[in-house]
Amino acid sequence: MLTINAVIRKDQGKGASRRLRLANKFPAIVYGGTKAPVAIELDHDIVLNTQTKEGFYTDVLALVIDGKESKVKVQAVQRHSFKPKLTHIDFVRA
């Protein structure tokens, strides 16, 4: 099972997302189940390398958010139109 580390986002909105992307991170969200949605930030290079591995899009992943592990699946991925960059990922709780 693939494991990805994440941090809960403190700031939200367009400006905060742009600052994240300039810091080589990007926003994501975890939703589904009975819990409330959680806005998180991920390290771009780590996720970019992880997404090339088999099973990233189809298997259940372990997402560690501030020390707490959640089982999630990738629901949607947004990419930059011509650069090899991820801009946002939606995770759904498994």
Curated annotation (Swiss-Prot):
CDD domains noted in UniProt: Ribosomal_L25_TL5_CTC
A single GO molecular function term of this UniProt record: 5S rRNA binding
Pfam family membership, one: Ribosomal_L25p
Q: Which domain of life is it from?
A: Bacteria
Q: Name one GO biological process term.
A: translation
Q: Which GO terms describe its cellular component?
A: cytosolic large ribosomal subunit
Q: Does the keyword RNA-binding apply?
A: yes
Q: Which UniProt keywords apply?
A: Ribonucleoprotein, Ribosomal protein, RNA-binding, rRNA-binding
UniProt keyword annotation of rRNA-binding present: yes
Give the InterPro entries listed for this entry: Rbsml_bL25/Gln-tRNA_synth_N, Ribosomal_bL25/Gln-tRNA_synth, Ribosomal_bL25_short, Ribosomal_L25_dom, Ribosomal_uL5_bac-type
Family, per the entry? Belongs to the bacterial ribosomal protein bL25 family.
General function of this protein:
This is one of the proteins that binds to the 5S RNA in the ribosome where it forms part of the central protuberance.
Assembly: Part of the 50S ribosomal subunit; part of the 5S rRNA/L5/L18/L25 subcomplex. Contacts the 5S rRNA. Binds to the 5S rRNA independently of L5 and L18.
Q: What is this protein called?
A: Large ribosomal subunit protein bL25
Q: Name its species.
A: Sodalis glossinidius (strain morsitans)
UniProt lists the gene as rplY
